């Protein structure tokens, strides 16, 4: 998988791939990470990439020309690149999207700044547009990193233990059940006793029940989307 970040601030993104799981993924050639700065493609003086909005409005927008030339170059080098824009005015990214996009060979994340990007560029170049939640960030870099991380961990060989994916939140429509480690008692709080008895069949059943309870409490929206037969089985 190749990730290309179109960003004015490479140094905000690059360090994330220098440690832990994603650093190993880069080292093992599971992912390749590249950065392109639209300033390198602007025709304006002083590497200008922003301009005031037509029709008024607070703040500046990223101009169309630098981004257009940047994306044109990327597309010429790889016609199959999948171009993703990050903006709060889009659908929320989810785990299903992460698993689907893990099948791509090259994803380009376009990271907006200022008050956003000239809409014509989004319409011309976007294969998909995502947001990471109902809130505003100062730029698209953090959102792009969220997507890249979620996608990368679904690429074969990136995680050391592939079973980790199967039991994570959202894999079956539920939040992940609570987990515990040593010591058995911490500050007067006990690990659920059934977890200590070694009966893995009972532990699986209990974890499933706890996952249902957790989802129903914290994410009733997800719980309502569960298949009726799954909810009925839990509620009996």
UniProtKB/Swiss-Prot annotation:
Tell me which CDD domains the record gives: TrmD-like
Recorded GO cellular component terms are: cytosol
Q: Which reaction does it catalyse?
A: guanosine(37) in tRNA + S-adenosyl-L-methionine = N(1)-methylguanosine(37) in tRNA + S-adenosyl-L-homocysteine + H(+)
List the SUPFAM superfamilies hit by this protein, alphabetically: alpha/beta knot
- The EC designation for this entry is 2.1.1.228
Q: Which domain of life is it from?
A: Bacteria
UniProt subcellular location: Cytoplasm
Its Gene Ontology molecular function terms? tRNA (guanine(37)-N1)-methyltransferase activity
Q: Which GO terms describe its biological process?
A: tRNA N1-guanine methylation
Q: Where does S-adenosyl-L-methionine bind?
A: 112, 132-137
InterPro entries referenced in this protein's UniProt entry, alphabetically: Alpha/beta_knot_MTases, tRNA_m1G_MeTrfase_C_sf, tRNA_m1G_MeTrfase_TrmD, tRNA_m1G_MTases_N, tRNA_MeTrfase_TRMD/TRM10
Record bears the keyword S-adenosyl-L-methionine: yes
Under the heading Pfam families, the entry gives:
tRNA_m1G_MT (PF01746)
Q: Which UniProt keywords apply?
A: Cytoplasm, Methyltransferase, S-adenosyl-L-methionine, Transferase, tRNA processing
Role according to the record: Specifically methylates guanosine-37 in various tRNAs.
Record-stated family:
Belongs to the RNA methyltransferase TrmD family.
Q: How is the quaternary structure described?
A: Homodimer.
Q: What is this protein called?
A: tRNA (guanine-N(1)-)-methyltransferase
Organism for this UniProt entry: Campylobacter curvus (strain 525.92)
């Amino acid at each position: 998988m190749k990730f290309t970040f179109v960003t004015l601030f490479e140094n905000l993104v690059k360090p994330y791939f220098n440690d832990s799981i994603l650093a190993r993924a880069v080292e093992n050639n599971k992912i390749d990470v590249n950065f392109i700065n639209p300033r390198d493609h602007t025709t304006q003086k002083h590497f200008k990439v922003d301009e005031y909005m037509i029709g008024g409005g607070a703040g500046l927008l990223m101009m169309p020309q630098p981004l257009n030339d940047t994306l044109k170059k990327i597309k010429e080098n790889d016609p199959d690149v999948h171009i993703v824009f990050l903006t709060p005015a889009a659908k929320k990214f989810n785990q299903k999207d992460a698993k689907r996009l893990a099948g791509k060979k090259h994803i380009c994340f376009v990271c907006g700044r200022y008050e956003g990007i000239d809409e014509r560029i989004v319409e011309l170049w976007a294969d998909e547009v995502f947001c990471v939640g109902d809130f505003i960030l100062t730029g698209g870099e953090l959102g792009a990193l969220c997507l890249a991380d979620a996608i990368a961990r679904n690429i074969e060989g990136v995680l050391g233990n592939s079973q980790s994916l199967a039991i994570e939140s959202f894999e079956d429509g539920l939040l992940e059940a609570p987990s515990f480690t040593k010591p058995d008692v911490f500050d007067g709080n006990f690990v659920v006793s059934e977890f200590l008895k070694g009966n893995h069949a009972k532990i699986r059943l209990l974890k499933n029940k706890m996952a249902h309870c957790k989802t129903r409490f914290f994410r009733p929206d997800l719980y309502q989307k569960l298949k009726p037969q799954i909810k009925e089985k839990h509620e009996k």
